């Protein structure tokens, strides 16, 4: 049967390898996106090309080397797995994937889908929460190709998503008597929320609210934080790494940490959270630091993606 409908999953992207030159090429595209770094081009590009791309790629490459696997980038491996599983669940669609930055490119994959006879494409960014820095670049790239293509903006309120998020934590939380659960979201500059009206912070807060209700957590049992601060500008707070350093001094020695904004392991989860933050916690007197990985290749998460597509299909038809 000819497949006339298609689903395109889109993740952030990843360097081709963990070698410095490949990391530099990736960072140049990512940090060069005016939606990611919202500064005047005349100011930002000389800083990016003259300073950051001369220093940061080597440092980032060393981080990537600590998380790289025999299959390559974990983010790439898990995105491929999610795509293959979703294709198995949705035989009525042609399911493919692309990356916002790097390969495979969004425009190339959409053109390939159209050339193969797919006429109705739905794009699903692999971000539960919308942000100007993550989902909007996907929307803009898609619009340049075909402004009639539907892009799903977020799915943080889908009950099956928050149910699965809670279930991924519940058993470990109940069995190990942690002092606190840390919900660490990727941060963005505060000005993107206050001046650009990015909905991201509000959607993260809503995700936490729905999640802790399902787990029945008391206010003192969890904290909502933001990670991955970049540059001198003020970002959303509190910063994960700052709280991780402070908690042992507040007699919080056993923590469980999760990352609800990520659906697949990547540098920010495997290195920043699981390695870097753990080291800071232990150095400051912490005793137990356990990390709950994102959904990765969980079939249950792929079923959530299928439900997101189905709900969107109904909404579009209505």
Curated annotation (Swiss-Prot):
Catalyzed chemical reaction(s): Fe-coproporphyrin III + 2 H(+) = coproporphyrin III + Fe(2+)
GO biological process: heme biosynthetic process
GO molecular function: ferrochelatase activity; metal ion binding
Highest taxon of source: Bacteria
GO CC annotation, single: cytoplasm
First-tier enzyme category under EC: lyase
Signal sequence bounds: none
Binding site for Fe(2+): 186, 268
Major location category of this protein: cytoplasm
Annotated NCBIfam families: hemH (TIGR00109)
Protein name, as recorded: Coproporphyrin III ferrochelatase
Organism: Lactococcus lactis subsp. cremoris (strain MG1363)
Organism classification: Bacteria, Bacillati, Bacillota, Bacilli, Lactobacillales
């Amino acid at each position: 049967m000819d497949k006339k409908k298609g689903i395109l999953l889109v993740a952030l992207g990843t360097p081709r390898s963990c070698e410095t030159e490949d990391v530099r090429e990736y960072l140049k595209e990512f940090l060069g996106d005016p939606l990611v770094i919202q500064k005047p081009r005349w100011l930002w590009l000389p800083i990016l090309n003259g300073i950051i791309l001369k220093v940061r790629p080597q440092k980032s490459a060393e981080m990537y080397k600590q998380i790289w696997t025999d299959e390559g980038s974990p983010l790439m491996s898990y995105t491929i797995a999610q795509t293959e599983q979703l294709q198995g669940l949705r035989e009525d669609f042609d399911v493919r994937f692309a990356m916002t930055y790097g390969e495979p490119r969004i425009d190339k994959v959409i053109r390939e889908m159209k050339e193969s006879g797919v006429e109705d494409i739905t794009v699903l960014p692999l971000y539960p929460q919308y942000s100007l820095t993550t989902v909007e670049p996907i929307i803009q790239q898609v619009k340049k190709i075909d402004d009639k293509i539907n892009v799903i903006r977020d799915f943080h309120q889908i009950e099956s998503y928050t149910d699965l998020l809670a279930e991924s934590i519940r058993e470990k939380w109940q069995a190990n008597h942690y002092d606190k659960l840390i919900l660490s979201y990727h941060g963005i500059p505060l000005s993107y929320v206050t001046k650009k009206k990015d909905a991201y912070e509000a959607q993260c807060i809503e995700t936490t609210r729905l999640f802790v209700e399902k787990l029945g957590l008391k206010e003192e049992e969890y904290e909502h934080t933001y990670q991955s601060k970049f540059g001198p500008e003020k970002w959303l707070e509190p910063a994960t790494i700052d709280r991780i350093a402070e908690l042992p001094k507040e007699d919080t020695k056993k923590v469980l940490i999760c990352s609800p904004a990520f659906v697949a392991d990547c540098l920010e989860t495997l290195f920043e959270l699981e390695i870097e933050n753990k080291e800071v916690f232990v150095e400051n007197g912490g005793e137990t630091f356990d990390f709950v990985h994102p959904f990765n290749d969980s079939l249950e998460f792929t079923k959530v993606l299928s439900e997101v597509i189905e709900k969107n299909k109904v909404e579009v038809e209505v």
